[in-house]
Design a protein with these regions (language model features):
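Conserved functional hotspots at enzyme active or ligand-binding sites that engage polyanionic ligands
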Residues: 1-113
Length: 113
C-alpha cells in the first residue's frame, strides 16, 4: 500500500510524532494503536490513537502487545490523543490482534462514559 492511499483503520499500529507534548504526555516519534474507525479517519484526517511504550509500569490502563508483532510493549489507553495522521505522516508498521483491540476499547470505556 502506498503512503498516498493509506488511511489508518482501527487496529492498525502506526508510527508518528507525538510532539509537541506537555507534562506527563508521551512524546517523540513512537508507535501507536489506532482506535478510531477508517471512515472517521479518512473524512477528518484525524485519528484517535493510544501511544505504545516499551516500558511497562503495571498501570491498570496498560494493555500488553503479544510477542511476534513488529512492535513490542504496552498500549497506554489512558493517553489517547486525537492527532492529524496526514500532517504527522503516519506510517503503518503493523496490526494488533483483535483481542488486543477489544481489550483497549474495554479499558477506554470507563474513561469516556
Amino acid at each position: 500500500m502506498t503512503q498516498g492511499r493509506f488511511v489508518p483503520e482501527r487496529g492498525d499500529i502506526v508510527k508518528m510524532s507525538f510532539d509537541p507534548q506537555s507534562g506527563h504526555e508521551q512524546a517523540g516519534l513512537r508507535p501507536a494503536l489506532v482506535v478510531s474507525p477508517a471512515l472517521y479517519n479518512r473524512a477528518s484526517s484525524l485519528a484517535l490513537l493510544c501511544p505504545i511504550t516499551s516500558r511497562a509500569k503495571g498501570y491498570p490502563f496498560e494493555v500488553a502487545l503479544p510477542d511476534g508483532l513488529a512492535v513490542s510493549g504496552v498500549v497506554l489507553v489512558d493517553q489517547i490523543r486525537s492527532l492529524d495522521w496526514r500532517a504527522r505522516k503516519a506510517k503503518l508498521v503493523g496490526r494488533a490482534p483483535t483481542p488486543v483491540v477489544r481489550e483497549v476499547l474495554a479499558r477506554l470505556e470507563p474513561l469516556v462514559t
